[in-house]
Amino acid sequence: KITIGNSVLFGPHVFIITGNHQVNQIGKCIIDVEKKTERCDADVVIEDDVWIGAGTIILKGVRIGRGSVIGAGSIVTKDTQPYSINAGNPCRKIRMRFTDSEIEEHEKRLRP
């Protein structure tokens, strides 16, 4: 399942992948494996006020924190901290968008 919050901006060619294939079944080609285990799939959550740059790939089980920015071409394999700016392969935190006091003020203005 994919959950997308409010005021989320997507660049072109963003992929969100919530599943994977079971690759460790002895005696079967990957294409012939019919049964998936629970750990093959996991939800993706994109919280409010997020910007995801062009060509980003978001893998299963990831939560993109409120107010985060994901740089173009990133491969997101882990959760992001709210109000962080992230980029790369694998995606990692570059810096915060705001200071703690600025986050508090931003939240007050968005949700009076």
Give the ranges of each region predicted by the language model:
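Short, highly charged low-complexity linear segments
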Residues: 27-29, 71-73, 106-112
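Short, basic/aromatic-enriched C-terminal tail that caps enzymatic domains
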Residues: 94-112
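Flexible, glycine/small-residue-enriched loop-and-beta-strand segment within the central core
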Residues: 1-60, 89, 95-98
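C-terminal/domain-terminus segments
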Residues: 58-87, 91, 102-105
